[in-house]
């Protein structure tokens, strides 16, 4: 246990500013990745002579964002769960309703978190997939229905690998350098877990950058608006951040940041889901809430329509939430207005207000001092949120920024700064939480206050609290509370072999050194004995260096085969969905179309294609099966079915005349 010394207080470089040097040998592209809770995006600098040329890279489906969803097909490898096929992005989202317990979304809310965290326990009640406790480190992990255990970092790495491959296909060259964004209020454990995910994906993560800072880079890189105080209000799928930045002639300095790492669109969706369930069981009293909530497929379908309703009400005043056969033979049709949505989610919206006020206070400015308010994250499209932001700052937010893309663009700009493609731009970010150590009586002794510019290095002198101590245990904490029991323990450093002296006499120099990623190094040295010790505070993200190396080696050994199987599986998945949609339509409108002469032929062809898909699923490793042929036949069948419906509709109209 340490006792804070009354002797010399050393303050070293507390506001160190880093001007990134260029490396003429570094010519590879550095991609910028927004690893979002709901959607992710990747960007690059298109023209090294144009700092405004940051460009989003479209994925293989031509979309500018990719759903942050990873699914496992447990049927693909019954004998070896480690060889299961994976689906990523939209391919995973399409099959979510029929494979909900093996489809992992919003896992960013779990990354770097302990299983016992109250936020994790709250998520367990609403997530259709299984969240389990890792016995070795107490972290929240994920489990498929057949028992494959994955850390959130491993799930994120699958998504990052997909974005890496997307970039390589687009750029026509190998990519291994990246800047990845994280919520500004992510702690050290969550940041390290994100870096681990990048490493697993085969990426050298040059920098982890805060999402609001990236958005400000994207906004302020334009010479016409490169001066002033900027507030970035970032409400995404799972996290909320507010950052205050001062932009002046290419220098981006973060003045303050605050937020909530467990507040976002997922919480809004859950409120709507609960409203729908309440309405449904009120209209169907014979059905209990427990029956609904325990049905994974039903809950996933409810979540999907809740998300769609939320999006609709950002553009229209009223919508209808409709689901046929939502439970057993019951159908769902619930009207919802924009005002109703506002009222039921107001408590969530109001949770963003205290962090905004605290950030303004920490930056020592008033709302009227802000020149521009930038909105980031899909949730900021909600009119009520825009209204609250306008009231908070006394001005309408800037609407020139795409809230889904600006973070990835900013990450690409930061990548351009690091590679030397972009010059004369300086980024000064901050540490979001206070860092310190435990001293006598369990007190928290801060060394680096929150909102200190990073990188930063600071040393302070401490002493012993007991006579004759030959060693000290230095516990490193992160948080804002006066007692360590209310803060987060992130590291433990033991210094032994010091000269036994009366308490208060030994001089123990404790140094905190935070790099530009926000990763912390701590060292301690005792003056008289010369003993010293140091650690890099890498909170347990769930994976050791050996485990990470092994996973990377396994991934490299199987990359070509994995890619081919993934492509075949995605083609079949699309064909399967098309066939299912056609089958459902034929059943629903059988009376209308059964008299058409093509009807029986198409029904037989549907059966044949269904059997072909079934054969493929039973023999997925048989590379002789013509997957492309199945997909082409499905496309042709869908076209014939459409013509059949058009003909039947026309005949019905003629009969009614």
Swiss-Prot record:
The keyword Transferase does not apply. Its EC number is 3.6.4.10. Keywords: ATP-binding, Chaperone, Hydrolase, Mitochondrion, Nucleotide-binding, Stress response, Transit peptide. CDD domains: ASKHA_NBD_HSP70_DnaK-like. PANTHER family: HEAT SHOCK PROTEIN 70KDA. Gene3D superfamilies: 3.30.420.40, Actin, Chain A, domain 4, Substrate Binding Domain Of DNAk, Chain A, domain 1. Its main location: mitochondrion. GO terms for molecular function: ATP binding; ATP hydrolysis activity; ATP-dependent protein folding chaperone; heat shock protein binding; protein folding chaperone; unfolded protein binding. This is Iron-sulfur cluster biogenesis chaperone, mitochondrial.
